[in-house]
Amino acid sequence: MTKYKVGMVSLGCDKNRVDSEIILGKMSSEYEITNNAKEADVIIVNTCGFIESAKQESIDTILEMAEYKNNYNCKLLIATGCLIQRYGDELKNLIPEIDIMLGVNDYNKIDRVITEFIEGNKEASKLLNYSDENINEGIRILTTQKESAYIRIAEGCNNFCTYCIIPKIRGKFRSRRMENIISEATDLASKGVKELILIAQDTTQYGSDIYGKKNLHILLKELSNIEGIKWIRVLYCYPEAIYDELIEEIAANDKVVKYLDIPIQHISDHVLKLMGRKTSKKDITDKIEKLRNKIPNIVIRTTFIVGFPQETQEDFEEILEFLQEYKLDKVGVFKYSREEDTPASKMDGQIDESIKEEREEKLMLSQEKISNNINKLKVDKKYDILIEEYDGEFYKGRNFEMAPDIDGNVFLESPKKLEIGEFVKVKIIKNMDYDLIGVVEDESCK
C-alpha cells in the first residue's frame, strides 16, 4: 500500500521548529515525509501567534496551502501551533478548508486524529486543549542542517511580561527531565549533530520547578560528556536569572561556546517597569560586567523592543547611549506590536507607527557601526568554522560567535573540497557589517 505523503510548513521561532520536528517524527512511521508541498497528500501548517506580522504570515500561509487542495494533491489540511491555540474557533469559521486543528498540547495525538478523521469522526477535527503539565517530546525529523540541532529544555513561561501572550498560550514554566534531554542529545549526536542549541522561553530557569533550584550549569556539564558534540550554545537567558554557577560552568567548559543570548528588551528603568520585567538598568549592566570579567571573550547577543507604550525620546536615547558604552556584539530590534489580551495593549500612550519605525532604523544604524568596528578586530585572527553550505563557489559557515539564522556568517573559498558539517581552521581576511570573509588555514580542526 502506497504511503500518504506529508508536507510541513513551519513558521515562527525555533521552539516552534522543534514542535514541527516532533510532529514529523510522530508521523514518519505511517507517512512519507516530503519537502514539496505540491506533492503532499497531507499538509501541516505549524503557525505562530506571537505578534501581528507573524499572525498575518500564518493566516496567509494557511490560505495558500488551502489552494493546494484545489490545484495539487492535498487531501487533508492541518493547522497547528500558537495561532490555532489562541484563535482556533475564529479560524475554523474564517478558513473552512482547514480539516483538522491541533493546539500546542495535542501533537502527540496527531496520528490518531488523522485516522479518526479519515474514518469519518469529524468531532476529532479540533483539539485545543490547554495544559500546564504536558511537554511535547519524542523522536524528531530534523529540519535544520544536519550538523546543528535545537533542544528545548523547558516549556512555558512564568515571567508574564506585559507585552507577551506566550504564558497564556504555552502555560506555566515546566522543565524537561534531565535524563530525557541527555537521551535526546545523545541520539542527535549519533546522527551527526555537532552543535546543540539549548532553547526555552527562559533557559536560565531550567530545573527550578522540578529540582528545586536552577540546574542549567549541571545540564551543560552532562551534555558536554556526549561524544561527538563540539559546541553547546545557550539562547534566551533572562538577565535577572543568570547565576554564578552558570557563569563559572560556561567559563570552564570547553564545549560550551562563549556566547549568551540575553533578551534585555530595554534599558530604561521607566520602560522596564512598564514591561513588567523583573530587572533594572543597574542589574543588567552589573551582569554584563560580571560576564565580561569572568569570561573575557564572551559574545553577548540581545534584543530590544522600541516604541513600547509611553516610551519617551529620552527612554529611547538611553538604549543608544547604553549600546555606545557597552558595545554588545549582536543586537536585534523589534517594533512593539500591540497584542490583544495583554496588559500593554490597554496602556495609555501608544506610540505612532512612524515613530516606532524611526526608532528601529536609528537603533539598527547605530548597532551596524558598532558591529562593523567589532568585526574589524577579527581580521587576521583564526577561528574554527563549522561548514554549513556550498553554493558552487563559496562555502558558508559560522564560528562560535554566530548562532544560526540570527547572526552573520563566514564566507570562504577553498581549493580543496570541504565536507558539510566539518570544522576547519580559517583565517579572517576581510570584514563586513555582520559577515566575515576568510581563507582556509587547515583543512580540519577535529
From Swiss-Prot:
Cofactor requirement: [4Fe-4S] cluster
Alphabetically ordered keywords of this record: 4Fe-4S, Cytoplasm, Iron, Iron-sulfur, Metal-binding, S-adenosyl-L-methionine, Transferase
Cofactor-binding details, from the entry: Binds 2 [4Fe-4S] clusters. One cluster is coordinated with 3 cysteines and an exchangeable S-adenosyl-L-methionine.
EC number of this enzyme: 2.8.4.4
Domain spans labelled Radical SAM core: 143-373
SUPFAM superfamilies attached to this UniProt entry: Radical SAM enzymes
Catalytic activity reported: L-aspartate(89)-[ribosomal protein uS12]-hydrogen + (sulfur carrier)-SH + AH2 + 2 S-adenosyl-L-methionine = 3-methylsulfanyl-L-aspartate(89)-[ribosomal protein uS12]-hydrogen + (sulfur carrier)-H + 5'-deoxyadenosine + L-methionine + A + S-adenosyl-L-homocysteine + 2 H(+)
InterPro entries in the cross-refs: Elp3/MiaA/NifB-like_rSAM, Methylthiotransferase, Methylthiotransferase_CS, Methylthiotransferase_N, Methylthiotransferase_N_sf, NA-bd_OB-fold, Ribosomal_uS12_MeSTrfase_RimO, rSAM
GO process annotations (BP): tRNA modification
Binding residues annotated for [4Fe-4S] cluster 1, in chain numbering: C13, C48, C82
Subcellular location: Cytoplasm
Single annotated GO MF: 4 iron, 4 sulfur cluster binding
Domain TRAM: 376-442
Described purpose of this protein according to its UniProt entry: Catalyzes the methylthiolation of an aspartic acid residue of ribosomal protein uS12.
NCBIfam families assigned to the protein according to its UniProt record, in alphabetical order: 30S ribosomal protein S12 methylthiotransferase RimO, MiaB/RimO family radical SAM methylthiotransferase
Family (UniProt): Belongs to the methylthiotransferase family. RimO subfamily.
This protein's name: Ribosomal protein uS12 methylthiotransferase RimO
Species of the source: Clostridium botulinum (strain Alaska E43 / Type E3)
